[in-house]
Amino acid sequence: MIKDALEAVQKRMADAMAKAGRTDRVTLIAVTKNHPVSAVETVAQLGVRTVGENRVQEAKEKLLTYNGPELEWHLIGHLQMNKVRQAVPLFSLIHSVDSSKLLDEINKVAAKCGKIQDVLLQVNVAREASKSGLTVEDFPEVRDYAKTLPNVRVKGLMCMAPFFEILKRLVLFFE
């Protein structure tokens, strides 16, 4: 079942890249939220090397029992300040950085760990109250601040647009 689903997603990705004329690398992140460590091991055996977890504690538990090829672990869920000390040593990329205060804490913990923590700045492009993230207006200031931190490296943005049936409306959020 996992193999068939993975192959279908990989085909859709390849088709989308071809349609867009892209030849650069795209990373598939296998989200294993609420799945057992055996699911992580299965996707790793199928060649996936990047895993996304929503919760720090769940990732920590899986890492303790995971037995398979080396993986890159990403935190894709909201990161609370009180979880930064646990998150930084575990994750190669944190997708949900939404404040200067959080950047400060990540920088401090990363320095203690002797690493540069890769992050994505989360921007709430749709201004949805139900979603976390920087406002479009606050983004430049936080981005510039992040550049001053020696143990944080901004790799890009994480943006989630609202669901629309009509693709043209969705594209407006990313222009």
Question: Which positions does each model-derived feature cover?
Answer:
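Conserved alpha/beta-domain cores
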Residues: M1-E175
